[in-house]
Amino acid sequence: MNDNNVIFDQRSDGLNAFFSKIYALMGAGVLVSALVSWIMITFFLDNMTAILQSGSLFFLVLWIIPLVMVVSLQGLAMKNSKMALPIFIGYAAFMGFLISFTLLMYTATDITLAFVTAAAMFFGLSVYGRFTKRNLSAMGKAFGVAVWGLIIAMFLNFFFASTGLTILISLVGVVIFAGLIAWDNQKITQVYNANNGQVSDGWAISMALSLYLDFINMFLFLLRLFGIAGGNRD
């Protein structure tokens, strides 16, 4: 009985360490993105304005790059490649560059409210996802598929620029990524148990990337909602 308790404690400590590593990587990614956005807005505002005036199609092309980077990064992470970590940081930096242009369209109040709300929701949903006894696999897979529908809707709205559709997309986006935050946290435990605690750094980077994307997208959808409520819209 005592031996079983020791094994359970060791497994629990290992899982906690795995979660800590993932959260640290995810937090580092968010910090890098925030820092790059701040640098862009603080020191390159004139350059950003010139780029904005070059046309919105330019940004449509730019937003395709992160999609390619995510696929490549996940592949490297699963292979436990040493390049996975620097590419993850580079990806976060590039996202910070892109997000900085979005932030220009909103007030500091909108940005702060969106970030604080996203952080609070992320914390609550992470706790729920980690400790709930309910199996969230079906929900997670359904929302994972729904993300592609969301991307298509956003692409179409890029041309129609409908405020009503923007609100609908943003509300649906918040719901989808709320579910994914809970699911991805539960999946961390599943991955750890499936590998009998022998999880590589690649797994940590892969899971950190998922949580990073969940948080960033939650923040951006909330920002659109707060912006529209405050009289700003992109």
Swiss-Prot record:
Transmembrane segments: 25-45, 57-77, 85-105, 108-128, 142-162, 163-183, 203-223
Membrane topology: Multi-pass membrane protein
Cellular compartments per GO CC: plasma membrane
Keyword terms, alphabetized: Cell membrane, Membrane, Transmembrane, Transmembrane helix
Cellular localisation: Cell membrane
Family the entry assigns: Belongs to the BI1 family.
Name assigned to this protein: Uncharacterized protein YrjE
Originating organism: Lactococcus lactis subsp. lactis (strain IL1403)
Lineage, uppermost ranks: Bacteria, Bacillati, Bacillota, Bacilli, Lactobacillales
